[in-house]
């Protein structure tokens, strides 16, 4: 069973941003701007990656997963571990996950990927239950130019 859907990878944007930093067009202070909440989330909820920080090259990056969804309530907008993501996926309808890489030494941070988890929303039936055809006339379903 595939859990992640609608995956968006931001690797090209990352490469482009790093090229700007390495060429001097973008300052290091502009990309090393992780706020304290993100750094704290990296410490307690993050997963250590195998990738070294592209800016300071002093430590491995930490991956932090953030969840967002209207029906998540207080959980929305918080960092979650991989185990918590699996649990949330079984309990809630669709919600989005944003994975951010962060360096706890120099505060580099960048969105790595985003995807959707949770039970897929059920599609609405195209025909009424029971298989009978609708008795609506064409005019009832028609739209006017002002709509």
Regions found by a protein language model. Give the residues of each.
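C-terminal/domain-terminus segments
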Residues: 2-8, 113-147
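Short, non-ligating residues that shape and space the ligands of small metal-coordination modules
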Residues: 59-63, 109-115
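N-terminal alpha-helical interaction blocks
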Residues: 1-36
């Amino acid at each position: 069973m595939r859990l992640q859907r609608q995956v968006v990878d931001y690797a090209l944007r990352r490469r482009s941003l790093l090229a700007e930093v390495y060429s001097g067009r973008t300052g290091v202070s502009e990309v090393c701007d992780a706020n304290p909440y993100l750094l704290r989330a990296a410490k307690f909820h993050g997963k250590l990656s195998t990738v070294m920080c592209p800016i300071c090259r002093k430590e491995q990056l930490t991956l932090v997963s953030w969840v967002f969804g209207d029906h998540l309530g207080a959980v929305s907008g918080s960092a979650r571990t991989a185990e918590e993501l699996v649990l949330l996926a079984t309990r809630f309808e669709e919600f989005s996950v944003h994975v951010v890489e962060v360096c706890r030494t120099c505060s580099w941070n960048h969105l790595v990927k985003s995807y959707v988890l949770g039970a897929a929303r059920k599609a609405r039936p195209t025909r009424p239950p029971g298989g009978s055809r609708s008795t609506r006339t064409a005019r009832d379903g028609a739209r006017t130019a002002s709509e």
